[in-house]
Amino acid sequence: MAAFLTKHGYCGRRPPAQLLTRLRAAPPGLCGTVEVEARRDAVLALVGVLRALLAAIKDLDRSVVAHLGEHPDAEIFTSLPRSGQINAAQVLAEWGDCRPAYADAEAVACLAGATPVTKQSGKHTAVSFRWACNKRFRQAICTFADNSRHASPWAAKVYADALARGHDHPHAVRVLARAWIRVIWRCWIDQTPYDPAKHGAAHKLTEMATTAA
């Protein structure tokens, strides 16, 4: 049981022995033999479908990784902290490679749903969640942003500051994604990989940490 839980990333809230005891103490099912067999066959059929789907996903992932390096902008996105090959490819695919398509970094942030919508009428101003956007782009850039805070002190600080202002986790991740978009935009326009030493805010945090140590 312990090995099974570890393999599937169980949070560890309850010990394996307690979970096993609960499973064994569960009341018996009330279904008849015929229904039990039918349900078993249905579950096994779904397992077969899932196995085939997972195999296809792995094949596609291998293909993405194999061809990502052929794109001239690949190094920009793979140089980002904890972007990974697959996530970097997702962000690159949604971001695109047409420089004239975007006026500035804010245009990219709007497309990716990383910036809110502000509505003004007279003295009234309302800020709301941006529903109209490229949702695949938002998922890709927010996945990267969430991962990046575990490798970049600057990203971790932007996220922590957003939480301190009262934002919940999804909102804080979008705030971080918007900040990253401005950084990536500069790299993308200059056609140069990300370098923390050239990223002013990130470099300053690194220097402060080094001085404190």
Which sequence ranges carry the predicted segments?
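A detector of single, family-specific signature residues
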Residues: 1-213
